[in-house]
Amino acid sequence: MTQQPYYETMYILRPDIPEEEVESHVTKYRDILTEAGAEVLDNQMRGKRRLAYPIAKHKEGIYVQLSHNGDGQQVGVIEKAMRLSEDVIRYLTVKQEGPLPAPRVAPGTEAPAEPEAAAPA
């Protein structure tokens, strides 16, 4: 059996929807992918950000990133659901070369390095 390709779907929700509704959209799209046979690997809320240009008269949007793998049939299913939703103002799915790397730790929050790495004086 060959390895299924990896995909990353980024979508932007309207900025005026409440937080509970944002969570329901995130859950809805995860469930759609799972029911279609894809494996959801990661889901990241990027938060409300300013758009580079207005989309549907909105200057901000709530960004959500969804990483998944499957045979490719699931991409059409989730994009159709997003196209029919009035709360999704933009979406894009790209095929990845491999799984996403582990999340990076923000500077200043990682544990201090071990002293064994220091050169002797």
UniProtKB/Swiss-Prot annotation:
UniProt keyword list: Ribonucleoprotein, Ribosomal protein, RNA-binding, rRNA-binding
Gene name tied to this protein: rpsF
NCBIfam families linked: S6
Residue runs in coiled coils: none
Full protein name: Small ribosomal subunit protein bS6
PROSITE patterns in UniProt: RIBOSOMAL_S6
Biased composition (Low complexity): 110-121
InterPro entries documented for this protein: Ribosomal_bS6, Ribosomal_bS6_CS, Ribosomal_bS6_sf, Ribosomal_S6_plastid/chlpt, Transl_elong_EF1B/ribsomal_bS6
SUPFAM superfamilies in UniProt: Ribosomal protein S6 (SSF54995)
Record-stated family: Belongs to the bacterial ribosomal protein bS6 family.
HAMAP family for this protein: Ribosomal_bS6
GO MF term list: small ribosomal subunit rRNA binding; structural constituent of ribosome
Disulfide bonds, paired cysteine numbers: none
Function: Binds together with bS18 to 16S ribosomal RNA.
Pfam families the record matches: Ribosomal_S6 (PF01250)
GO cellular component: cytoplasm; ribonucleoprotein complex; ribosome
Chain segments carrying region Disordered: 99-121
Example GO biological process: translation
